C-alpha cells in the first residue's frame, strides 16, 4: 500500500512541477527554467543520495555515461517545457506517454530484445493514438505538437542509457548525477537567454525544484516497495492531474479527440507493462 501511495503522490508532484514550469514560461526561457530547477534541486539531490546510499552513492564509476544522460535530460526537459508554452498541459502529458512504446521499439530493433507480436500491435496502436491527438493535416494541427513526442523519444533513450551506468551505482547516484550534469551543462548556454529573476517568481523556481525532486524520489521509492506491475500503470494518473491543473489555472479543456487518443496511448502502455511483467515471470 505504501508503494501505491508514494507512486500516486510522486506522479502528482511531477504534474505540479510541470504546471509551475508552464507558469514560468510566461516570463523565462525554458532553458533558464531548467537551469534554475537543477541548480536549486542539487543540494536536495545530494542530501537524498547521501541519506539513502551513504558515501558510495556520491561516487560515479562511469562519469561519461552520466554526462550523456545529462545531455539527454537537458534535451528532453527543454523540448517539453517549450511544448507547454503553446499546448495544453493535458495534451502535452498525453503525448509524453508514448515513451514506453519507444522503449519497447528501440529495445527490439537495436538491443536485440525479444518483443512478441502482441506488444508490437500495442506499439502500433499507441502511435495511432498519437495521430488521433496530433491530427496531422487537420485544421487544429500545430507543429509544436510533435515536441512532446520528440521528448518521449529522448526520454526513452535516457531510460535505456541507465544500462550503460555501472551496476554498482544506485538509483540515488543516478538521480544526483542527472541533476548535477543538468545544472552544469545548461550553465554554459543559459547566459544567452538569461533574464533577471523577479522576486515574486523565486518561490516558483523553488517550487519546481522541490516538487520535481520529490516526485522523482517518491516514484523511485514506490518501485522499491511494490511490484513494478502494480505501480507502473499508476504513472498514467498524471493525465488526470494534468487535466485538472490545466483547467484550474488556464481554463484548458481538452477536446474529445484528445481524450480518445490519450485513452488509446494509455491502454497500449499499460498492456505493454503487463506483457513485459508476464514475460519476465
What residue spans do the PLM features occupy?
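Hydrophobic transmembrane alpha-helices of multi-pass small-molecule transport proteins
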Residues: 118-135, 151, 257-276
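Transmembrane alpha-helical segments that form core, pore/gating elements
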Residues: 22, 30, 137-197, 204, ...
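Structural signature of hydrophobic alpha-helical transmembrane segments
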Residues: 29-43, 82-99, 141-154, 198-212, ...
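Helix-helix packing/entry segments at the starts of transmembrane helices
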Residues: 36, 93-98, 165-180, 217-247
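C-terminal transmembrane-helix exit sites in multi-pass transporters
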Residues: 80, 99-121, 240-259
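Loop-to-transmembrane-helix transition segments
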Residues: 2-10, 49, 55-79, 143-151, ...
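Hydrophobic/small/kink-forming positions within alpha-helical transmembrane segments
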Residues: 11-16, 46, 70-78, 100-105, ...
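Transmembrane alpha-helices of multi-pass small-molecule transport proteins
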Residues: 2, 28-75, 154-158, 177-192
